[in-house]
Amino acid sequence: MHLQASVEDYDSFARSLTIGAETMVMKFRPELPMHDRYEVAYDFLPPSAGLEVLAISKLINAFFRWEFNSCESLVVGDEVHPIDYANACPDIAITSLHYYFPWAISALLKWSTFCAVTGRTPRLDTNTRDYFDVADSDRSYGDKLAEYARLADAYFEKDRYQEFCATSLASLDEIVLDWVASPDFDALLVDTVKSTYPAHEQDHFVAHFRGLLSLWVHDNSG
């Protein structure tokens, strides 16, 4: 058990989902029902805070050797306050992530394929000394974050992963886009809604999620 200081009147609740070498930082509203908690928001964090949230998310996963995790932070102005960084089986249900669901499935597919084809395996040795050396140094906080991000990118072989995606999986994004726009995906959505919500709410939620996923298709077309 541990105690955390409260952060009053925060500007944004950032929930970042990290899958392998990729991270999506999303605006989260914990006070709302599950289907409304993720707000479709673009550039909702100040640039410096966005980079810090991204670096912390990657750092946590690399340090603990996690490949699928979410990290939660409260942001006040440019200040980032991590509050919960151990969600090693995060919720990625279509009825929760909605707009961000295609990205999550695509990232899972890319990372799994990359690991399977290249033979990449997680390292059992966590090399914590590398991270403690950064923490114990006289560098500024910003310089430490930059070095943590470098260590994380090296562990997840970010450059090699991106090259693999650009060459071996070059058509995957288009395939996923076509899938999300297809009748088969819509049938999956309808079946999920029917198995999740009571009958009198199903039409409402089918329309709700169709709208959000249609927005994703629009934003990722062309």
PLM regions: where:
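Phosphate-binding site of ATP-dependent enzymes
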Residues: 1-61, 80
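Short, well-ordered beta-to-alpha junction loops that form the rim of enzyme active sites
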Residues: 6, 73, 85
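A short glycine-rich, hydrophobically flanked beta-strand micro-motif that places a catalytic Asp/Glu
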Residues: 14, 66-78
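C-terminal active-site "lid" helix and adjoining low-complexity regulatory extension at the edge
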Residues: 48, 76-222
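Surface-exposed helix-capping loop/turn segments at secondary-structure junctions
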Residues: 64-67, 119-120
